[in-house]
Swiss-Prot record:
GO biological process: brain development; camera-type eye morphogenesis; closure of optic fissure; cornea development in camera-type eye; embryonic digestive tract morphogenesis; embryonic skeletal system morphogenesis; eyelid development in camera-type eye; glial cell proliferation
Protein name: Transcription factor SOX-11
Gene: SOX11
Pfam families: HMG_box
Signal peptide: none
Outcome when changing residue 47 to S: In IDDMOH; uncertain significance
Reported tissue expression: Expressed primarily in the brain and heart, with low expression in the kidney, pancreas and muscle.
CDD domains the UniProt entry points to: HMG-box_SoxC_SOX11
Length: 441
C-alpha cells in the first residue's frame, strides 16, 4: 500500500510531455494531465467542465498507461474490460489510497468550479408528439393507446381507467357463475364500442369443473397493432365454448351400452354408422333396437352351430374361400355381432356420405371384434381365444377394403387377393415358426 501511494505521487509529478496523446482524453480531469494551478485544469477545449474522477478512474488511469505500454495494439474496449475485472478483484485495503486521491480531486473540483452542475448528455431528439407518451409508464401507454398524442398523461390515465372498467364488466358475469351464453353476451357488448382508445385482446373462456358454469373471462391488453385480431379472438371464443357445451350431453350412450361390457369412455359421441343393408343380411334385419342385439349375440354364442348359419357371410365371402370346419362354432359370436351391427345401423336414419360410413364402420367392427374375444371366452372355453384372434386378424386384413366401399353395400367387395394370399388367409393363423411368415421373393 505504501508502494502504491508512492507510485501515485510519482505519477502526479510527471510532466505533461511524457504523456501519450491517446490517453489524454482519460486524463483531462487528472492532476497528472493538467497543472492544478491552471484555473481551467478540468475543462475541455470546447469549455465543457469534466466531472471529477472517482477512485476507479484514478486507479484505471495508472493501470491503463501500463497496459498500453506493454501492448500498444490492444483495443481500448478490451483494456477497459480487463481493468474492470481487476478492480473488482482488488481488496478494500488496496483501494484506500485511490479513494483518498479521488476525494481530494473532488474537493478541488468543487473549489475551482462552484457553479458546476452535472448535466448528462442529451439523448437524440424524438418526435415532439411522442414526448408525452414516452413519459408514461408502459402499462398506461399500452392501455391508453393514442392517448399520449391526444391529451398527454391525463388522457392515458383516463383511458386506462375506462379500460379497467370494461374489464370489470367482463369479469362480473363470470364471477356470478354464468354459462357460456352470458360470456358471449358480455363479449359482444364490449366489442360494440369500437370508438374506444384501448385494445382488448385474447378473450378466452375456459370451463372450470364439469359443467358450463363458472366460466372465467381473461382480459389482456395488447398493442395498437392488434386491432385486426379482434375478430379472430371472437371466433376462438365461440370455438372454445362449443366443445364445453357438447360435454354436457353426450348422445346415444344408452344405445351402445350393453350391461357390464362396454365402458362409457369407448363410446362415440356421434351416431352409429349408417350402413345400407345388403340383401343377404335380411335374415337378421328384424332386430329393431340395439338393446336386443346383445341377446342375439349371446344366443348365437350358446347355440354354437345355430349361429354358424350366419358364419359363412362374415368375412370369408370376401376372399371367396370356405372356412375351415373347426372354426365354425368359434366364429359364431364374431359373425353374428358383425351382422347385427350392420343391420342395426341400417335401420337408423338415412346414411351420409359413404366415405364417412366406411370410417365409422371400421371403428365399430374393430371395437366389436376386440370385445367378442371376452364374451366368447366366458361362454366357450376352448374356441373363444381362437375366435378373438381370428376375427381380429380378419379385421386387419380387410381394413383397406372398407375404405374402398363407395358403391352399393359395404359388404360387396371385389376380390383383391392373389391365390397365394388367399391360401395363407384361409390357413392356420397361429404358425409354429416365425420364419414361415417372412416373405422371400
Amino acid at each position: 500500500m505504501v508502494q502504491q501511494a508512492e507510485s501515485l505521487e510519482a505519477e502526479s509529478n510527471l510532466p505533461r510531455e511524457a504523456l501519450d496523446t491517446e490517453e489524454g482524453e482519460f486524463m483531462a480531469c487528472s492532476p497528472v494531465a493538467l497543472d492544478e494551478s491552471d484555473p481551467d485544469w478540468c475543462k475541455t477545449a470546447s469549455g465543457h467542465i469534466k466531472r471529477p474522477m472517482n477512485a476507479f478512474m484514478v486507479w484505471s488511469k495508472i493501470e491503463r498507461r501500463k497496459i498500453m505500454e506493454q501492448s500498444p495494439d490492444m483495443h481500448n474496449a478490451e483494456i477497459s474490460k480487463r481493468l474492470g475485472k481487476r478492480w473488482k478483484m482488488l481488496k478494500d485495503s488496496e483501494k484506500i489510497p485511490f479513494i483518498r486521491e479521488a476525494e481530494r480531486l473532488r474537493l478541488k473540483h468543487m473549489a475551482d468550479y462552484p457553479d458546476y452542475k452535472y448535466r448528462p448528455r442529451k439523448k437524440p431528439k424524438m418526435d415532439p408528439s411522442a414526448k408525452p407518451s414516452a413519459s408514461q409508464s408502459p402499462e398506461k401507454s399500452a392501455a391508453g393507446g393514442g392517448g399520449g398524442s391526444a391529451g398527454g398523461g391525463a388522457g392515458g390515465a383516463k383511458t386506462s381507467k375506462g379500460s379497467s372498467k370494461k374489464c370489470g364488466k367482463l369479469k362480473a358475469p363470470a364471477a356470478a357463475g354464468a354459462k357460456a351464453g352470458a360470456g358471449k353476451a358480455a363479449q359482444s357488448g364490449d366489442y360494440g364500442g369500437a370508438g374506444d382508445d384501448y385494445v382488448l385482446g385474447s378473450l378466452r373462456v375456459s370451463g372450470s369443473g364439469g359443467g358450463g358454469a363458472g366460466k372465467t373471462v381473461k382480459c389482456v391488453f395488447l398493442d395498437e397493432d392488434d386491432d385486426d385480431d379482434d375478430d379472430d379472438d371472437e371466433l376462438q371464443l365461440q370455438i372454445k365454448q362449443e366443445p364445453d357445451e357438447e360435454d354436457e350431453e353426450p348422445p346415444h350412450q344408452q344405445l351402445l351400452q350393453p350391461p357390464g361390457q362396454q365402458p362409457s369412455q369407448l363410446l362415440r359421441r356421434y351416431n352409429v354408422a349408417k350402413v345400407p343393408a345388403s340383401p343377404t343380411l335380411s335374415s337378421s334385419a328384424e332386430s329393431p333396437e340395439g338393446a336386443s342385439l346383445y341377446d342375439e349375440v349371446r344366443a348365437g354364442a350358446t347355440s354354437g352351430a345355430g349361429g354358424g348359419s350366419r358364419l359363412y357371410y362374415s368375412f370369408k365371402n370376401i376372399t371367396k374361400q370356405h372356412p375351415p370346419p373347426l372354426a365354425q362354432p368359434a366364429l359364431s359370436p364374431a359373425s353374428s355381432r358383425s351382422v347385427s351391427t350392420s343391420s342395426s345401423s341400417s335401420s337408423g336414419s338415412s346414411s351420409g356420405s359413404s366415405g364417412e360410413d366406411a370410417d365409422d364402420l371400421m371403428f365399430d367392427l374393430s371395437l366389436n371384434f376386440s370385445q367378442s374375444a371376452h364374451s366368447a371366452s366366458e361362454q366357450q372355453l376352448g374356441g373363444g381365444a381362437a375366435a378373438g384372434n381370428l376375427s381380429l386378424s380378419l379385421v386387419d386384413k380387410d381394413l383397406d377394403s372398407f375404405s374402398e366401399g363407395s358403391l352399393g353395400s359395404h359388404f360387396e367387395f371385389p376380390d383383391y387377393c392373389t391365390p397365394e394370399l388367399s391360401e395363407m388367409i384361409a390357413g392356420d393363423w397361429l404358425e409354429a415358426n416365425f420364419s414361415d411368415l417372412v416373405f422371400t421373393y
